[in-house]
A protein has these predicted regions:
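PLP-dependent amino-acid enzyme catalytic core
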Residues: 1-481
Length: 481
C-alpha cells in the first residue's frame, strides 16, 4: 500500500511512502494528510470470512491491507499484544472484555458500541494502544527515538500518555487547554509522573493547541532535528485502527452480509467518523454516517449548508462534552479530499483559505450535492439535550452514558430509519464526567477499580502561553537534557 498527501505531495518515483514511513511522520511535507493511494475493496466473500473472526483476527485481516510493509508475523504479534481482555478490562459487569468492543442492544434495532473499556475509559484507547506498540516496534527495529507532540481537548492526551509511558525511545509532549478539561480528565494526565511524559497546559482553547502542533510539524528543520512525531488523529495509523471496530460492530448487529446499518458518531476532530467513512468506501454496508456535534457545530453547519467556517478562539464554547469543544476539525481534510474526487489542487486551494483563518463554501456545487452519496447526515446537541438524553437512557435502559455519547444518541435518534439497525458509538465511560452525570441523574457514576480517588493524586504540569516558539523552546530544552 502506497500513500499520498491530500495536498498532492508524492515521494519520488521508486520511493513511495509506505505505512511505516507515515507512521512516524504526522503531517506530510506539504502540510497535507496521508491517505492510501486507493482504498482496498472487499468482496462479499471477504465479508463472509470476516464475520467469523474475533477482534484480533479481524484487526490483522484489515490492518495488513494498510500496513503491508510490516511482516505479517510481526503485525500479528503487535495486534495480539494490544487487544487483550486485560488491557480492555474496564467492561461493565454484563459485557465480555474478550470482545474488546462489545455491542449492547438497548432495544430492537438500537445498539450501543462499547469502545471505552481501555485503560483511560475512552474510545481513543482502541487505536492508541496499538499506536504505542507500533511506534516501539518500528523505533526499536530502526534504532531510532521519537518525540511525540500532541494536542488534546480531553481524552487523546491521557490515552496517548498511557499508551506511551515507559516505551523505549519515546518522549511525549502533550498540549491541553488550561482549565478546560474535566477534573477526571485533568487528573488522568497530570498525575502521571513518568519521566518521558510532559504535560503543557496552554492558556487558550484546544484549537490553539492543535494549531501549535501543526505549526511545529510544518517546521521541517525543527521536526527533523528533534524527531517530532504525532499521535493526534491526523496520524493515519490511528484512523486505520479505528476502521476495525466498524466492521466488528456491523457483524455483531446483523445476521447476514449485505444488510445495511447506520452509525451515529459524536464528532469533534472528525477522526472517529472518518474511519467509518473509509469502512464504507471499502465496501462495508453502511447506509448512514450520522455526525453529532455539540454547541461547537462547525461540522454540522458544513453538512447542512456546505459552508466550512472554523471559529476563532473566542467563539469556541466550553461545554459539558469538552472533548468535542473543537472548531477546526483536523481530519475533515481527508473526507473533503474524497468528496472533491481526490483533486489535491482543490484541497490545497480550500485549505489555503482555512489556514489563513478563512472559510470555504461548497454549496451549489456538485461536490456538496454528492455528500448524500457518501451517506452523511448531521445534527447538533446542547447541554439541555445531553441532560435529557442521559436521563432517558438511564430510565429506559438502566444504563449510564457519558455526555459525548449522549450527543451521539440524541442526534442518532433524530435520523433513525425504520428497519435499519442504528449503532451509536460510546466514546467514554460516564465516570469521566461525574459533574454532569450528577446534574442529570442526581447521583454519581460508579468508577472502575483503580480510579476511585484519582483527583487526589499529586499532579505535574507546566502552564505555557499559546506560542509556537515557547513550545519549541520547551521541547529543545528537554530533548537536550
Amino acid at each position: 500500500m502506497e500513500y499520498i498527501s491530500t495536498r498532492g505531495h508524492v515521494k519520488d518515483a521508486g520511493s513511495a511512502s509506505r505505512f511505516t514511513d507515515i507512521l512516524l511522520a504526522g503531517l506530510m511535507p506539504d502540510g497535507g494528510l496521508a491517505m492510501p493511494m486507493d482504498y482496498p475493496r472487499l468482496a462479499a466473500s471477504d465479508l463472509a470470512a470476516m464475520r467469523r473472526m474475533n477482534y484480533r483476527e479481524l484487526a490483522l485481516s484489515l490492518l495488513s491491507l494498510f500496513a503491508d510493509d510490516i511482516p505479517l508475523a510481526d503485525l500479528k504479534a503487535t495486534i495480539d499484544r494490544t487487544y487483550t481482555a486485560d488491557i480492555y478490562g474496564n467492561a461493565r459487569a454484563d459485557e465480555d472484555p474478550q470482545d474488546i468492543t462489545p455491542l449492547r442492544t438497548l432495544e430492537p434495532g438500537l445498539h450501543l458500541l462499547a469502545l471505552s473499556n481501555g485503560p483511560t475509559l475512552a474510545f481513543k484507547d482502541i487505536a492508541m494502544q496499538l499506536l504505542g506498540n507500533l511506534f516501539e516496534y518500528v523505533l526499536t527495529r530502526n534504532g531510532q527515538s521519537l518525540n511525540i507532540l500532541g494536542a488534546t481537548s480531553g481524552d487523546t492526551g491521557s490515552s496517548a500518555e498511557y499508551a506511551m509511558r515507559g516505551k523505549r525511545g519515546i518522549r511525549v509532549f502533550m498540549l491541553s487547554p488550561l482549565g478546560k478539561m474535566s477534573a477526571f480528565q485533568t487528573a488522568q494526565m497530570f498525575s502521571l509522573q513518568d519521566p518521558n511524559i510532559h504535560n503543557l497546559a496552554v492558556r487558550g482553547v484546544f484549537d490553539d493547541c492543535q494549531d501549535i502542533v501543526k505549526a511545529v510539524s510544518n517546521d521541517h528543520a525543527f521536526k527533523a532535528k528533534y524527531r517530532i512525531g504525532t499521535v493526534n488523529s491526523i496520524n493515519w495509523a490511528r484512523v486505520s485502527a479505528q476502521i476495525v471496530y466498524y466492521f466488528k460492530a456491523y457483524f455483531a448487529a446483523t445476521r447476514h452480509d449485505g444488510e445495511a446499518v447506520s452509525f451515529s458518531v459524536p464528532s469533534g476532530n472528525f477522526g472517529n467518523i472518518c474511519a467509518g467513512h473509509i469502512a464504507r468506501m471499502m465496501g462495508l454496508p453502511i447506509r448512514r454516517l450520522i455526525l453529532a456535534t455539540n454547541e461547537n457545530d462547525v461540522l454540522d453547519e458544513f453538512f447542512r449548508t456546505g459552508v466550512y467556517r472554523p471559529r476563532a478562539t473566542a467563539e469556541t464554547r466550553q461545554t459539558s462534552s469538552p472533548s468535542m469543544d473543537i472548531s477546526k476539525a483536523s481530519n475533515f481534510e481527508r473526507f473533503v479530499f474524497d468528496l472533491v474526487g481526490r483533486d489535491a489542487s482543490k484541497v490545497r486551494e480550500l485549505w489555503t483559505s482555512v489556514d489563513r483563518g478563512g472559510a470555504f463554501d461548497l454549496s451549489g456545487t456538485p461536490w456538496f450535492a454528492g455528500i448524500a452519496d457518501h451517506g452523511f447526515v448531521s445534527g447538533r446537541s446542547t447541554h439541555a439535550d445531553r441532560l435529557a438524553t442521559i436521563r432517558r437512557v438511564f430510565e429506559r435502559h438502566e444504563l449510564m452514558i457519558d455526555t459525548h455519547t449522549a450527543d451521539g444518541i440524541k442526534v442518532g435518534l433524530e435520523h433513525r430509519e425504520a428497519g435499519v439497525p442504528l449503532i451509536c458509538l460510546e466514546t467514554a465511560l460516564p465516570a469521566k464526567f461525574a459533574e454532569t452525570i450528577g446534574e442529570a441523574l442526581g447521583r454519581a457514576p460508579l468508577r472502575p477499580p483503580g480510579f476511585e480517588n484519582i483527583e487526589d493524586l499529586p499532579q505535574r504540569s507546566v502552564a505555557i502561553e499559546p506560542d509556537v516558539q515557547a513550545v519549541k523552546d520547551f521541547i529543545a530544552r528537554h530533548v537536550a537534557a
